[in-house]
A protein has these predicted regions:
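Basic, helix-initiating cap at the start of DNA-binding domains
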Residues: 1-32, 39-45, 62-65, 87
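Flexible coil/turn residues that form the inter-helical turn or adjacent wing/linker of helix-turn-helix
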Residues: 35-36, 56
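Short hydrophobic/aromatic patch on the recognition helix
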Residues: 46-57
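Hydrophobic alpha-helical connector segments
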Residues: 66, 80-109, 162, 184-187
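Short, basic, alpha-helical segments at the C-terminal edge of helix-turn-helix-like DNA-binding modules
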Residues: 69-75
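Amphipathic alpha-helical packing segments from all-alpha helical-bundle domains
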Residues: 76, 125-149, 153-161, 168, ...
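Amphipathic C-terminal alpha-helical segment
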Residues: 106, 145, 163-180, 192-207
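Amphipathic alpha-helical segments used for helix-helix packing
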Residues: 106-127, 144, 168-175
């Protein structure tokens, strides 16, 4: 394939080249919806060829899956680290609020990319949607740990409902431009939503 760009390419080892492509893809998918991102643009930003992108990630959807998987792992790692930093004696309400604040920070760093699959689920990559669904189960498990809840179907309905509320509220926040002065209200609303759902389910909790 004939090169369409004439920028000199830096020689990198395979792991460095893969990381450079992934970095470029992360920035591209953070700035635009999936359909608006091209492999050619990612390759050019990474100083690589389209053939190399396909060699490392097989396809555009494979590249997107890698970005989504990395983002999920980063969010969970940051949330666990923030919770650990609070200490085991921290109030449950504070621990939950902190996890929400971490989520808001992650969203504010790439609002377009975060919101795209929520605004148009039909345009999402099925494999990436599967990653998000499995991640939601991991978030539910994390919430159980924060709240000290046993596995219970009714309580899990409340936890899933809370995550749905949080995403819907955050989507509205993104639409408003992610104003930082609204973060406190979002955190308070989300905590209250979960507390209310658990109350309605008859689940004893420590958010009161």
């Amino acid at each position: 394939m004939t090169r369409t760009d004439r920028r000199p390419r830096q020689r990198l080892d395979p792991e460095q080249r893969r990381a450079a492509i992934l970095d470029a893809a992360r920035e591209a998918f953070a700035a635009a919806p999936y359909a608006a991102v091209s492999v050619a643009a990612v390759a050019a930003a990474a100083g690589a060829s389209e053939a190399l992108v396909h060699r490392y990630f097989a396809s555009k959807s494979g590249l997107y899956q890698a970005v989504v998987a990395e983002g999920i792992d980063e969010l969970l790692t940051r949330q666990v680290a923030a919770d650990t930093a609070l200490g085991s004696r921290a109030a449950v309400r504070l621990r939950l609020a902190t996890s929400i604040e971490v989520y808001l920070e992650v969203i504010s760093n790439s609002p377009v990319g975060w919101a795209a699959p929520l605004r148009d689920a039909h345009a999402d990559v099925p494999a990436a949607a599967g990653l998000r669904a499995r991640a939601r189960e991991r978030y539910v498990e994390l919430l159980r740990g924060i709240l000290g809840l046993a596995v219970d179907p009714v309580a899990d309905h409340a936890l899933h409902g809370y995550l749905g509320f949080l995403d819907a509220a955050c989507l509205s926040w993104v639409g408003a431009g992610c104003p930082p002065e609204q973060r406190g209200a979002l955190v308070a609303m989300a905590v209250a939503a979960l507390a209310g759902a658990l109350d309605a389910a008859g689940v004893v909790h420590a958010l009161s």
